[in-house]
Amino acid sequence: MSELTKAQQQNFTKLQKKIRRNTGKAIADYNMIEDGDRIMVCLSGGKDSFTMLDILIGLKKSAPISFDLIAVNLDQKQPGFPTHILPEYLDTLGVEYRVVEEDTYSIVQDKLIEGKTTCSLCSRLRRGILYRTAKELGATKIALGHHRDDILETMFLNMFYGGKLKGMPPKLVSDNGEHVVIRPLAYCREKDIIKYADLADYPIIPCNLCGSQPNMQRQNIKQMLNTWDTQFPGRIESMFTAMQNVVPSHLADFNTFDFKSINRDSGVINGGDIGFDKEEMPVQPVDIDDAVTEFDPSLKLDIVNVQ
């Protein structure tokens, strides 16, 4: 880390506590990490994965359980990829790591159409390699650096372009059914991670080395959410809270809720015909410190749910 002013150091410490608190809360809520786990931390060289590794290292030191971390980077043989940066950085941390070399760049370039994105193909290839690597390393969990904004963006992408009310789960079983994938930063805001990574002075590696165009649908969603965040303070917090407070009886998916069996003897279900009552809506705080996590200080080091 470069030399910080006193004000910058105070801001860094505040951000670190916030991100660590939110990460610990997410880990506890979804039982992401258990005693004896070997966590494969996927390190791309971007701000999110650097922050995730940093926070997990800190939690490991103070956690009431024992777990191991191994950082894994996939060198996809993109022209100009600085192969020395991550090994040098990880050596300074003293963390176990592995760099996996696979030329997925050439495969993707063969499919690349000018002006189009091949991110989905690249992602599928990358996932397959990471799943294989996790098995080779004996990892029990695979940690990805997606944050709360990614989760909300994915939900709106599915709503607007896929016709599904579906987001990005904080914890899931991998596509091949062999691994548990976790997203420890699920409660963290991207804007906090950006500020934290800037102050931490991570050796960020550009994500556009492949030459592919950005996913414009996701970029449009991101811009929409950023606009809402500015114009309507608290809206982002409220939307994420909604993802944790689903009422299937008041949606329209008959595969999720048994509408067919409802009759007069069923009784009032989840408020009956009250679709929305503004009077009953809790006021959503603007600051993430008071939003979503509502952190209990007694849980600050308990990164697993022991009950």
Swiss-Prot record:
CDD domains: TtcA-like. Gene3D superfamilies: HUPs. It is found in: Cytoplasm. [4Fe-4S] cluster binds at C119, C122, C210. Pathway: tRNA modification. A motif (PP-loop motif) lies at residues 44-49. Its EC number is 2.8.1.-. It catalyses: cytidine(32) in tRNA + S-sulfanyl-L-cysteinyl-[cysteine desulfurase] + AH2 + ATP = 2-thiocytidine(32) in tRNA + L-cysteinyl-[cysteine desulfurase] + A + AMP + diphosphate + H(+). Pfam families: ATP_bind_3. Its cofactor is Mg(2+); [4Fe-4S] cluster. The thiolation reaction likely consists of two steps: a first activation step by ATP to form an adenylated intermediate of the target base of tRNA, and a second nucleophilic substitution step of the sulfur (S) atom supplied by the hydrosulfide attached to the Fe-S cluster. Homodimer. This is tRNA-cytidine(32) 2-sulfurtransferase. It comes from Aliivibrio salmonicida (strain LFI1238) (Vibrio salmonicida (strain LFI1238)).
